[in-house]
């Protein structure tokens, strides 16, 4: 007990009342301070405040569920001392470490541990979290003297003119009306439609042979209906909509 000399307030947790006064007196003599006494079975019902003791001594007990409570009852850097304990020392050391104690050491039938030098749940500022002073100064720059730019001045008269829809097609940039291989602007479909119309016009033939004489000799479905008479064999250009279905 000489290593605990000078500790002001201690708690002695007992299991056997025989010679209890003698053991408590020995602890008082060793520490030179005040000693409180508590039964191990009544510890869970006690109402000790946090950071109340510099030293807690446990006699002949294995407190599986109360080591965390003892950690709160100790002051920062407070000591926990077990002697004549029950069970293997390795198991007790593991339970004590998992409860938050540090600097655990094993002696002859004794175990000693220490609470960290800070209060449970406390926080500390991290050194690498310092903010760059130059970055902070950027936000201090005053913008009162800055003039706002008129949005209308950013556009020229040419920018305000509407573009030609034909020029918006990607394929028209080549100068010749030719669709790209993977055309997606619609020019390929447009050229294909014009090609089919022209082919149909070239292949248009008269079934009755009287189309060139005029409307008086033409059928009701004649593609030349409404057109003036023409010479036999003469090439006549039909309108695009004449060869398309009305449905």
From Swiss-Prot:
Family of this protein: Belongs to the anamorsin family.
Motif Cx2C motif 2, residue range(s) on this chain: 219-222
Motif range (Cx2C motif 1): 208-211
GO biological process: iron-sulfur cluster assembly
Disulfides per UniProt: none
Organism: Drosophila persimilis
Record key words, sorted: 2Fe-2S, 4Fe-4S, Cytoplasm, Iron, Iron-sulfur, Metal-binding, Mitochondrion
Cellular localization per UniProt: Cytoplasm; Mitochondrion intermembrane space
Protein's name in the database: Anamorsin homolog
Residues reported to bind [4Fe-4S] cluster: 208, 211, 219, 222
Annotated region (Fe-S binding site B), positions in chain: 208-222
Region N-terminal SAM-like domain, residue ranges: 4-128
Domain notes: The C-terminal domain binds 2 Fe-S clusters but is otherwise mostly in an intrinsically disordered conformation. The N-terminal domain has structural similarity with S-adenosyl-L-methionine-dependent methyltransferases, but does not bind S-adenosyl-L-methionine. It is required for correct assembly of the 2 Fe-S clusters.
Single annotated GO MF: 4 iron, 4 sulfur cluster binding
Binding-site residues, [2Fe-2S] cluster: 171, 180, 183, 185
Main location: cytoplasm
PANTHER family: ANAMORSIN
Any Gene Ontology CC annotation: mitochondrial intermembrane space
């Amino acid at each position: 007990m000489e290593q605990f000399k000078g500790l002001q307030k201690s708690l002695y947790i007992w299991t056997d009342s025989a010679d209890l006064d003698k053991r408590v007196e020995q602890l008082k003599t060793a520490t030179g301070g005040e000693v409180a006494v508590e039964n191990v079975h009544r510890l869970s019902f006690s109402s000790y405040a946090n950071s109340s003791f510099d030293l807690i001594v446990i006699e002949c007990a294995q407190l599986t569920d109360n080591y965390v409570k003892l950690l709160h009852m100790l002051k920062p850097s407070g000591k926990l001392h077990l002697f004549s304990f029950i069970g293997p020392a390795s198991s007790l050391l593991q339970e004590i470490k998992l409860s938050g104690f540090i600097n655990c050491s094993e002696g002859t039938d004794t175990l000693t541990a220490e609470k960290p030098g800070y209060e449970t749940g406390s926080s500390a500022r991290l050194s690498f979290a310092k903010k760059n002073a130059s970055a902070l100064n950027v936000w201090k720059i005053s913008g009162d003297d800055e003039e706002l730019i008129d949005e209308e001045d950013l556009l020229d008269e040419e920018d305000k003119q509407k573009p030609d829809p034909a020029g918006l097609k990607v394929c028209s940039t080549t100068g010749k009306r030719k669709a790209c291989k993977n055309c997606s602007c619609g020019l390929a479909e447009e050229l294909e439609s014009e090609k089919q119309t022209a082919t149909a016009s070239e292949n248009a033939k008269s079934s009755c042979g009287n189309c060139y004489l005029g409307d008086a000799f033409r059928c009701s479905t004649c593609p030349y209906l409404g057109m003036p008479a023409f010479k036999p064999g003469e090439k006549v250009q039909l309108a695009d909509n004449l060869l398309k279905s009305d449905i």
